[in-house]
Curated annotation (Swiss-Prot):
CDD domains: DEADc_DDX49, SF2_C_DEAD. This is ATP-dependent RNA helicase dbp8. It holds the Pfam family DEAD. InterPro entries: DEAD/DEAH_box_helicase_dom (IPR011545), DEAD_box_RNA_helicase (IPR050079), Helicase_ATP-bd (IPR014001), Helicase_C-like (IPR001650), P-loop_NTPase (IPR027417), RNA-helicase_DEAD-box_CS (IPR000629), RNA_helicase_DEAD_Q_motif (IPR014014). One of its GO terms (molecular function) is ATP binding. The Q motif is unique to and characteristic of the DEAD box family of RNA helicases and controls ATP binding and hydrolysis.
Length: 526
């Protein structure tokens, strides 16, 4: 049986005069066609070709490029803002009122490129007053935008009269200093601003050269800047005598007295700067202490305006975001590590970026090694690590290469890592204010977060003091279908965690790093 010949496509240019059902092939052309072309007329012998109708996709593209096409929708959250459009968008958008705060147009545009278009309460309150030249005490909970509240007016006043070292920012930790340094660099990108970072853990010589080069803004930890003032020579630090603006970020920690106080170093730094009557002083903190308030009562020159004080108060005394869920988990003293392992492994927490806070560096070191052996993606941040390793570990956590950061209170202040959705207090902090700063690493800028505190029999009074400080009681931790005690028994986690802990302790005793490599005890002589 002969199979039927498949039908060939027929040109759309059809004439009624053509013969009924029979179609003849066209006469041979000088250019041999790759495929047999059919024609409806026997006398159609030329090589003319009728193009097929455009494909729908092509026609849609054509319509987009047509002159009468509608203009593209303005860039939203899903569309990146181009630098050339940022200024126009920032000044035009009603939702953004930075322009209404008398912020310079170039700064409005720079903030818009960073997706910062609407000022927060602390920014609305402080920016206009700082631009007027007033000293300022700004109190607002963590994650409320205090860095922008002092950076924007500082950069605007510097741009009006750029010279030498215009501003100094003091902050208690190296990681927070690095974060402020990077944020100021980003905001000042349209201008030729020269910030410099002065922190411990790195060589002093390049820092001394940078200070002698008269940078525009110095971001420093008090201890290292005090070392330069004492030992680097007059030529290095003489530029500090013309500073116009000084910022104490996390001022409660900088001005606190007692063991480990930074106050002597802060006083050394301030002694190298102009007197308070000749400079502008800004204090920002999440917890306004009596030492911070004391700035308001300092003697002032007659021509200087009074200190501006603002405490942005919301519910829960303005310390804990309403989007933060606070819980506690009762744990026996001998099985705290096993409870932590199971808590991090539940269905609800297994994928959450988390920070685990400890009271001691040795505890943080041990937990990192133990959790690594239990197949958690973990890194650490504490003072036993060299500065280069601290920076690298923090970068890994920011980039989600590690899901868990085990840290001491060195990471509790100021660090802004928006992805963090879980904070675990492995050790209950002794000071309720430290608890406020720890849990402030999550639920930032309106996002949701959870804080879980592991509570033993000896920690009850500490928890009660924390609840009184924040004005809210903790709830007992629970997850649907999950029993921590049941999983410990059923899965054999107690034995697994015990073995991992013993291996970690042996590794520490042998002087190995977290990857099991033998540490080189020879130190470089500087």
């Amino acid at each position: 049986m002969t199979s039927p010949v498949p039908s060939e496509p027929v040109s759309e240019d059809t004439h009624d005069s053509s013969s009924g059902s029979e179609v003849e092939p066209s006469k041979t052309s000088t250019r041999a066609p790759k495929r047999r072309r059919l024609s409806e007329s026997s006398d159609d012998s030329d090589d003319s070709y009728v193009a097929p109708a455009p494909l729908p996709t092509l026609s849609r593209i054509k319509k987009k490029g047509a002159p009468d096409a509608k203009p593209a929708a303005p860039a939203g959250q899903d569309n990146p803002v181009l630098i050339r459009d940022a200024l126009e968008i920032g000044l035009r958008e009603e939702a953004s009122s930075f322009a209404a705060l008398n912020v310079a147009p170039w700064l409005v545009g720079s903030l818009t490129t960073m997706a910062v278009r609407k000022p927060t309460a602390i920014q609305k309150a402080c920016i206009p007053e700082i631009l007027k030249g007033r000293d300022c005490i700004g109190g607002s909970r963590t994650g409320s935008g205090k860095t922008i509240a002092f950076s924007v007016p500082m950069l605007q006043k510097w741009a009006e009269d750029p010279f030498g070292i215009f501003g100094v920012v003091l902050t208690p930790t190296r990681e927070l200093a690095l974060q402020i340094f990077e944020q100021i660099k980003a905001i000042s990108a349209p201008q030729s601003m020269k910030p410099v970072l002065i922190t411990g853990g790195t060589d002093m010589r390049p820092q001394a050269i940078a200070l002698a080069g008269r940078p525009h803004v110095v971001i420093a930890t008090p201890g290292r800047l005090a070392d330069h003032i004492k030992s680097s020579g007059e030529d290095t630090v003489c530029g500090l005598k013309r500073v116009r603006m000084v910022v104490l970020d996390e001022a409660d920690r900088l001005l606190a007295s007692g063991p480990g106080s930074m106050l002597p170093d802060v006083e050394t730094c301030l002694s190298a700067l102009p007197p308070s009557s000749e400079r502008q002083t800004l204090l920002f903190t999440a917890t306004v202490t009596p030492e911070v308030r004391a700035l308001k009562n300092m003697p002032r020159s007659a021509n200087k305006p009074p200190v501006f004080v603002t405490e942005i108060s919301t519910e829960n005394q303005g310390t804990i975001p309403p989007t933060l869920k606070q819980t506690y988990l009762k744990v026996p003293l001998t099985h705290r590590e096993a409870f932590l392992h199971v808590l991090l492994s539940t269905e609800g927490n297994a994928s959450k970026p988390a920070i685990v806070f400890c009271n001691h560096t040795k505890t943080a070191d041990l937990l990192e090694r133990m959790l690594r052996r239990l197949s958690h993606r973990v890194t650490s941040l504490h003072s036993l690590l060299p500065q280069s390793e601290r920076n690298a570990n923090l970068a890994r956590f920011r980039a989600s290469a590690a899901r868990i950061l085990v840290a001491t209170d060195v990471a509790s202040r100021g660090l802004d890592i928006p992805t963090v959705s879980l904070v675990i207090n492995y050790d209950v902090p002794r000071n309720p204010d430290d608890y406020v700063h720890r849990v402030g690493r999550t639920a930032r800028a309106g996002r949701r977060g959870e804080a879980v505190t592991l509570v033993g029999q000896r920690d009850v009074q500490l928890v009660l003091a924390i609840e009184e400080r924040v004005g809210r009681q903790m709830e007992e931790w629970s997850e649907e279908g999950v029993s921590i005690e049941g999983r410990l028994v059923r899965t054999g986690a107690l034995k697994e965690v015990g073995e991992a802990k013993r291996e970690a302790m042996v590794e520490i005793d042998e002087g190995r790093d977290v990857l099991g490599r033998k540490r080189n005890k020879l130190k470089k002589v500087r």
